[in-house]
Structures are given as C-alpha cells and as structure tokens.
C-alpha cells in the first residue's frame, strides 16, 4: 500500500482492489448493488440459464422506479392496477419475480418505502461512505455525495456483479472541482451543478472521477450534495465524490441499513480517514467562484447549454468550434428558439418537480415556499410534483406540503422516475415546453418532440405560477402561512 498522500478516490479504489492486472486495470470488489426493472431482467435470466446463484444478495437491493405509474397503483379493494404499456409491465413483472427468487430484498411498487433507487439508497442507509456502489443507471454517481465510489454500469456488468461481486475496471484520473466562497441565498445546488457543467462541458470530465471541494460544497446539506453529485455524469465524469463529514454521519445515523452500536463507531473512524490527504495531487483542478453562480436554465438539448435566467439564447456563430456551432443550430431548431431571445418570459406548458436530482424533502420545501399563496398559471397544462420516495411523500404530507401544491393546482403523485424520461405514462407532448427539475434535456427525453428546460425546484415552481421561465428573485416574497 502506498504511503504517498492520496485523494479520496484513490483511497477507496485501493481498499477495494482484489487483483492488479498487467494492463493497469484491476479487479475491484463491489460492496453495494442497486437494481431496478429496466437493466436487470437480462442479467437475472443469464444467471438462471447458467445455474448460478447471486453471490451477495445481502448486498443487493431491488426497487422498481423507471416504469412505475405515478398515479394510483391499486384499486379500491387493494388489487394492483394493470400497467398499460406491455414492455413496462413485462419488466416490472420480471423484477417482482427475479428479486425474491434470488434472495434479493425487493421494495415493491406498493411498498411504503418504494421510490427512485438513488433516493431510496441513501435514505435507507444502504449507501455508505467508503463503499463501492453500482447500479445499471447512469445517475448512480449521486451516491458519491455520501463519500461512496458510485457509478453506473451496463447490463452485462450488472450480470457480472450479480455473479461475482466484482468488476474489472481501469482507474480514473482525478479532478478536483473546488467551489470557493459562499452561494447567494437565491442560488440552489441545482444552479451550482448546472454552472459547473456549463464550465466543464459535457466532455470535460471524461475519464475523471470528480471530487467536489471548497467552502460552498461544505456548506451544502446532504440533500443538496446529492443533487450536485447526481449530475456529474452530465459533465462526462464517471463519478462525483464529496468527502464524508459530520453532516454525513448525522444524516446516516439510525438509518435502517446503516451500522449500529460499536459497528457504527468503528465505521465512522474509518470514514474519517478517507478524506483526501494534505499534499495529495489531483490530475486536474478546476476552480469555481460561488459568487458567479446565478439562478440558471438550459436553452438547448445538452446539459452544458446553460445561461443565467437573466441571459439570452446564444448565437451559434459565437462558438469557436464548428461542431459546437452545428450542434447549437440543431438545438435552436428543435427548441424553437432564436439567437438573442431572452430566457426570462419564455412560456411553458408543463412543469415537473421530481427525479433523482430534485425530489427530496428539501427540494419540495423549496418549491412549496414559492408556490404558497399562488396558483398555477392558466397556460400551464400539466404541473406535477413527484416525491422521490414513499418516505419523502409521507414527510411532505406530514408538513402539509401536499396541500400547498394541490391548492395551487399541482398534481400530487406517487413516487417514481415519472416525467424525467419517457418510459412511463408521464410525458411532455410534442412541441411543448417543460420547466423540469430533472437532469437531462436531450432530444425526446421527456417525450417525442418535448422541449426541456432544466431548472431548480424553486425556479420550476416560479415558472408554474407565472406561466413562463421566471427569475424567482423578481417574485414578491411570501412567507408560508401568508397570502401572496
């Protein structure tokens, strides 16, 4: 084991090496495996055909989330309602069969703890600092917010982890993204990560494991950190780590699957030792000034297409790279925008508050604080609030947030991935715009022809009540309990 100063990433990597290989890769032990209905059926079937057991069912957790409807799931007598889409129904049925057959804990669609895997993992204490965690889903990097080395894998790798609890991997380069200073009170973690992605570009993190550091990162709550780490993949990075600290330990203490008693004390001591050593050298360091971050919105079809809400649509000719110019022209055509057009005031027909990026209780509180005493604008046809899990939903209802949203004209839904992606009934109609708290604004991501503008929960709420993309700083402040 090297005694040279090491980064957080290097410490976790080194602790999980089973075997070093001549080509520089290594066989890495995987501590945790999250499974959902979309990328697991083929892997389970391959195990079944080969007569292999799942190596560590106790380190595996299965949760349906992508295809589940967010409307009622059972009828008045408690019977499951049928899933309309045949492919979705098949995938959900497969997970319901496969997980119990292979001894995996299965949180069903009707379980009060069901939700999006990247919300359920942390809140259950399944995600822990210093662990390696994988899922057949690109936004697995979210768990890095708790100091885990977490990343998405493909279906063939899902099978490999199920069978061996290992993966052959090549070590990533390390990148420090240091956010210096304090964020403005009107700036959210979503604004911060959109700003970072714009600064790095969607390929800027390719080949790197990002570690987020600096005063602004330390000041974030755990749920805000989860938002930042979640979108590391949109910057091209394999994962996005934040060193565990006292906030992390307080968040995890007492969680159902977190260590207990003496095991907890032992775990915390080890977690503390994982912080990047003084003198450790990153392959690259990027410095972000917190004061430069403003409430932001995407204008195009790439997560790097970000401007402040006070900004305008850029002219494709302003990009130096011809490929970027061409991409910008295609984006503007798809999005129905013109160079120089102001983002503020752009009408939206749909608003989505949810996804593994922004569906936790703090996100819903932020949105509700904007919605309170106001009503969804007449031109907004669809305004959904989709909690990230059953636990989040019940907490929000205990705080009365559901009533705030419903009184304002929002639909209050059951947990799931929902309108983040067009794999369930929640979609944006072709040609319509959506102010969305999700993580991707790709062509067709929210439905064929859908036009997505990525924003924070507070910005999405502001768009809903005004009917257009709005600088929330211009809204008359209203305290919960008062009238607008």
From Swiss-Prot:
GO molecular function: 3-isopropylmalate dehydratase activity; 4 iron, 4 sulfur cluster binding; metal ion binding
InterPro entries referenced in this protein's UniProt entry, alphabetically: 3-IsopropMal_deHydase_lsu (IPR004430), Acnase/IPM_dHydase_lsu_aba_1/3 (IPR015931), Acoase/IPM_deHydtase_lsu_aba (IPR001030), Aconitase_4Fe-4S_BS (IPR018136), Aconitase_4Fe-4S_dom (IPR036008), IPM_dehydratase_rel_enz (IPR050067), IPMI_cat (IPR033941)
Binding site for [4Fe-4S] cluster: 356, 417, 420
Enzyme Commission number(s): 4.2.1.33
Cofactor note as given: Binds 1 [4Fe-4S] cluster per subunit.
Reaction(s) catalysed by this chain's protein: (2R,3S)-3-isopropylmalate = (2S)-2-isopropylmalate
Purpose: Catalyzes the isomerization between 2-isopropylmalate and 3-isopropylmalate, via the formation of 2-isopropylmaleate.
Name this polypeptide is given: 3-isopropylmalate dehydratase large subunit
Lineage: Bacteria, Pseudomonadati, Pseudomonadota, Alphaproteobacteria, Sphingomonadales
